[in-house]
Amino acid sequence: MKGGRFQAPATWFGRREADCAGYINSRSSKTIYQRASVSVDQVKRACRATMVAIALMVLPPRFVAAITAIRLHQSRRDLKEALREALGRDVALVEPGPVPPPELIAATSLMSKSDLQLKSQKHVYLAHSYRSAAWILNMARAAGLTFREGMSIFELGCGEGRLISHLRALPRARLVASDVRADTIKWCRNSLPGIEFHVNELEPPVAFLESNSVDLAIAQSVFTHIPLAWQRAWLEEIARVIRPGGIFWCTIIGQHHIDVMLDKDARQILEETGEFELDGKDPRSSYSTQLIGSWDVFQTEPVVRREFGRYFEIANYQKNPAGPDVLVMRVPPLG
């Protein structure tokens, strides 16, 4: 807006994007992307996310407020569009509910303690959750999932419900979510009506779900923290509850976090064995992992394809240059 409070942030972004555009689209850069199995669009999104993070740290408060307001508006719009594409018609978004207390956010989604103040802000928290919900809907639809009234969705490791709360916009959907933290589930039950919340154990089963009953299962930032010795049991359990033709969407630690979190010796072990873990006592682990005594779990692509491929068809293995990688998998339909 000319003459308004959004002018300076828009100008700042425009100049930074112009600085990056030539390099991002150069022939040599595209060759690098192909070798790394990432797309130009993914790199652009990563660059923009990096610019947003820098802007939120260095710009004056009034500009930060403008940027977060823009991101929230764009994220809500993205979710409405994703719902429209999934259902073939417009549906109203559901009020997301309160922002959880900082101690719950800290236990689920922080790489470092310094992130807490920013990620606890309402606009930032909601923008991220709207965007994640839209991302999952779009990827599940692209993998062949048919969205319909009365479908069933399960989120394992739901944390404070930031993601599944938005899926209440799906007409008459059965929404089920679970987490190992009883305090988190207590907050969810009191704050987010319309969702079945359960406390699950560190190991399966999830006895509250019938076999072949779920259309879409979600595990965001879950298999990034499940010890390798337990992963097969959880994969088998998730495959049990998903109906034939259903979709499993999950994140895993990718090259970005390998480069950021592991030193040379750890990367060498990972390359040789295909697997590596950091427990919460290791200073290299993420802040949330240290806070709750969990694990950060690293796997190479061949190991991921071998282990997850035992139970699912991998429809999409999306590598993220600025965050976790994503797997979109399906249970083969009958016949």
Q: How would you label these PLM feature ranges?
A:
Residues 33, 39, 46-57, 73-149, ...:
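Class I (Rossmann-like) S-adenosyl-L-methionine-dependent methyltransferase catalytic domain
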Residues 155:
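Class I SAM-dependent methyltransferase core
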Residues 207-217:
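A short acidic, Gly/Pro-enriched loop at the edge of an enzyme's catalytic core
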Residues 216-229:
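A short SAM/SAH-binding and catalytic strip from SAM-dependent methyltransferases
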Residues 232-244:
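A short glycine-rich, Lys/Arg-flanked "PGG" loop and its adjoining helix->strand segment in the class I
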